[in-house]
């Protein structure tokens, strides 16, 4: 049984908790969030601020971590701030997800219920492949990406670091979604999208630039 600590106790964290409970090989060991000011042991799991990582590892040496925060930029900041190595993070896949044996999934990534990851897809670290999302064959998905529920990437799509593909959006084959860009919900992407823009509509068009650095 793998002991899992999640960092983040918002709505996304609730879903991660249920995913952990849905698996037969994981148990929730701790919830770390800034709203907890002190490190304490509860009836079922420990709670504390993110800085309690060191104390938690002393008590549970084999504990593995997952950053349960939906915001891509904040997730990157936490991954860098916690001072943990790649082997300290767990990859969580819901039992109902379908993942090709040839797919490669990075550390700290979560694959939610009903998601589909097809042949030779490559998914980076600390990504969220949300409920019912589809990453088709030969997709290249970089670190800190979020595919929202029912987002669909056709074959050989590339999604660069920190990009967010909105709920129900669809992307045709061989498109590139630029780093830290946002694709609006329900959009149909038929042309590649550059870095740090918001695109929406069917077909998707650039509607604004994103000025923040998102470098963590």
From Swiss-Prot:
Top-level taxonomic group: Bacteria
Entry annotated with the keyword Signal: no
Reaction(s) catalysed (UniProt annotation): UDP-N-acetylbacillosamine + acetyl-CoA = UDP-N,N'-diacetylbacillosamine + CoA + H(+)
Similarity-based family: Belongs to the transferase hexapeptide repeat family.
PROSITE patterns, alphabetized: HEXAPEP_TRANSFERASES
Biological function: Catalyzes the conversion of UDP-2,4,6-trideoxy-2-acetamido-4-amino glucose to UDP-2,4,6-trideoxy-2,4-diacetamido glucose, commonly known as UDP-N,N'-diacetylbacillosamine (UDP-diNAcBac).
SUPFAM superfamilies: Trimeric LpxA-like enzymes (SSF51161)
The name this protein goes by in its record: UDP-N-acetylbacillosamine N-acetyltransferase
Binding site for acetyl-CoA: 146
Regulation: induction: Repressed by SinR.
Enzyme kind, highest EC tier: transferase
Subunit structure: Forms oligomers.
GO MF annotation terms: acyltransferase activity
InterPro entries (UniProt xref): AcTrfase_PglD-like, Hexapep, Hexapep_transf_CS, PglD_N, Trans_hexapeptide_repeat, Trimer_LpxA-like_sf
Active-site residues, record numbering mapped to chain: 137
EC assignment: 2.3.1.203
Effects seen without this gene: Insertion mutant shows decreased efficiency of biofilm formation. Disruption affects swarming motility.
Keywords (A to Z) from UniProt: Acyltransferase, Repeat, Transferase
């Amino acid at each position: 049984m793998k002991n899992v600590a999640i960092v983040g106790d918002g709505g996304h964290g609730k879903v991660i908790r249920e995913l952990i409970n849905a698996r037969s090989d994981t148990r929730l060991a701790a919830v770390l969030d800034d709203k907890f000011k002190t490190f304490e042991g509860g009836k079922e799991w420990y709670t504390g601020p993110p800085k309690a990582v060191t104390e938690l590892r002393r008590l549970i040496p084999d504990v593995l971590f997952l950053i349960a925060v939906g915001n891509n930029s904040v997730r990157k900041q936490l991954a860098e701030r916690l001072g943990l190595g790649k082997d300290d993070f767990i990859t969580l896949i819901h039992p109902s997800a379908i993942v090709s044996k040839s797919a490669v999934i990075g550390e700290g990534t979560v694959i939610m219920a009903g998601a589909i990851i097809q042949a030779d897809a490559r998914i980076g670290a600390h990504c969220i492949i949300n409920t019912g999302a589809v990453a088709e064959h030969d997709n290249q998905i970089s670190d800190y990406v979020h595919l929202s529920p029912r987002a669909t990437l056709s074959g050989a799509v590339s999604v660069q670091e920190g990009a967010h593909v909105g709920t129900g959006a669809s992307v045709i084959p061989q498109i590139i979604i630029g780093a830290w860009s946002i694709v609006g919900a329900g959009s149909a992407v038929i042309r590649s999208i550059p870095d740090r823009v918001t695109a929406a509509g069917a077909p998707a068009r650039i509607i604004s630039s994103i000025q923040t650095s998102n470098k963590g």
